[in-house]
């Protein structure tokens, strides 16, 4: 059972009722354009979030000194979409930077609690077949139920001794594993992996790999780039294509895999706290992981609500560390190589 959280307005406690308080900011008093520019989401979507998260963000007995769920949601959206605790963001809704930080923490945890509600892999055959049909219609790649990749998000150094979060560029980061469908809906998100881990190691240790290795999704596969090992359930591109069929396979693979690359750019453009433009996330790895997951939940909710997430200008994620390519290891999985060869022979010859 979720435990409701009350955030007290520090400004009200310090200065009394004469100081401007959160509850004086009303959504109905501002324009839709203002809400989009400041918080990145339209009015009705914000109202939906307040209703969805309200039980977590307020106590059963309303206290006059508690920050309203509405204001907590606005504070969190302001941070997610700007990547900053700038004074102007707090001033816009009448709270201090300290209060805003607590609002972000509480909304983040409330969204993380609901991650499984909005980020889920399809289980029924009809939904899986629909995914395959949609991906096939995109570039002619059969059997695909999702595309997988990893993205690094910069975080502050946990401590001087811990090098596990230092990636190949010498920066501290989390390496986040994600799978999306053709619309950019995230079906799997794992945000807790340290930046020193290569993509292939993240996937190998993930719950996603365990599911596919256990045979939960037979006759289906994911598409991954050359930073992953070829598997019976994970098709990767050929390192050096030679035949026309191999070239056609690689072209279809690239066109299909580009969906998740676009999804990453969209995520980081909408949620600027992830793109590194305002610096690394100034939190512990655990809290940073939760913030990333909360943004992914919001991304999926906005897609469910029919929001156009692709039209905003795309800035892209932080510069990603280079990955090793593992095509020279593919021969270790002879069955996976056989499946890919059969795929090329049947569909790309």
UniProtKB/Swiss-Prot annotation:
UniProt KW Zinc-finger keyword: no
Metal-binding keyword on record: yes
Enzyme superclass (EC): hydrolase
Residues annotated as domain DDE Tnp4: 148-300
Tissue-wise expression: Detected in brain, eye, nerve tissue, kidney and lung.
Species of origin: Homo sapiens
Name of the encoding gene: HARBI1
Binding site for a divalent metal cation: 149, 199, 225, 261
Family to which the UniProt record says this protein belongs: Belongs to the HARBI1 family.
InterPro entries for the chain: HARBI1-like, HARBI1_animal, HARBI1_dom
Subcellular location: Nucleus; Cytoplasm
Quaternary structure annotation from Swiss-Prot or TrEMBL: Interacts with NAIF1.
GO MF, one example: nuclease activity
Function text: Transposase-derived protein that may have nuclease activity (Potential). Does not have transposase activity.
The protein's Enzyme Commission number: 3.1.-.-
Named cofactor requirement(s): a divalent metal cation
Keyword field: Cytoplasm, Hydrolase, Metal-binding, Nuclease, Nucleus
GO CC terms in record: centriolar satellite; cytosol; nucleus; plasma membrane
Protein name (record): Putative nuclease HARBI1
């Amino acid at each position: 059972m979720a435990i409701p959280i009350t955030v007290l307005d520090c400004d009200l406690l310090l200065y009394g009722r004469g100081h401007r308080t959160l509850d004086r900011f009303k959504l109905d008093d501002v324009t839709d354009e203002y809400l989009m520019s400041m918080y990145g989401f339209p009015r009705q979507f914000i109202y939906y979030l307040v209703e969805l998260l309200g039980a977590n963000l307020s106590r059963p007995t309303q206290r006059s000194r508690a920050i309203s769920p509405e204001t907590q949601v606005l504070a969190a959206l302001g941070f997610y979409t700007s990547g900053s605790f700038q004074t102007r963001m707090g001033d816009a809704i009448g709270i201090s930077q300290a209060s805003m930080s607590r609002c972000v923490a509480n909304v983040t945890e409330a969204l993380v609690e609901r991650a499984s509600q909005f980020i889920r892999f399809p289980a029924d055959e009809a939904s899986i077949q629909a995914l395959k049909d949609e991906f096939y219609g995109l570039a002619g790649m059969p059997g695909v139920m999702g595309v997988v990749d990893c993205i690094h998000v910069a975080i502050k150094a946990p401590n001087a001794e811990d090098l596990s979060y230092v990636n190949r560029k010498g920066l501290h980061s989390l390496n986040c594993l994600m799978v999306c469908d053709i619309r950019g809906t995230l079906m799997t998100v794992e945000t807790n992996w340290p930046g020193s881990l290569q993509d292939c190691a993240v996937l190998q240790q993930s719950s996603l790999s365990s599911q596919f290795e256990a045979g939960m999704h037979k006759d289906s596969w994911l598409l991954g780039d050359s930073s992953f090992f070829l598997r019976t359930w994970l098709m990767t591109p050929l390192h050096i294509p030679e035949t026309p069929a191999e070239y056609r396979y690689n072209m279809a693979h690239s066109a299909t895999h580009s969906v998740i690359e676009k999804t990453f750019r969209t995520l980081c453009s909408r949620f600027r706290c992830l793109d590194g433009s305002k610096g690394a996330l100034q939190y512990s790895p655990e809290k940073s992981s939760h913030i990333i997951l909360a943004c992914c939940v919001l991304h999926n909710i906005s897609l469910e609500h029919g929001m156009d997430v692709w039209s905003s200008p795309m800035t892209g994620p932080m510069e990603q560390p280079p990955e090793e390519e593992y095509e020279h290891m593919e021969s270790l999985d002879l069955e996976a190589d056989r499946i890919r060869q059969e795929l090329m022979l049947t569909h790309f010859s």
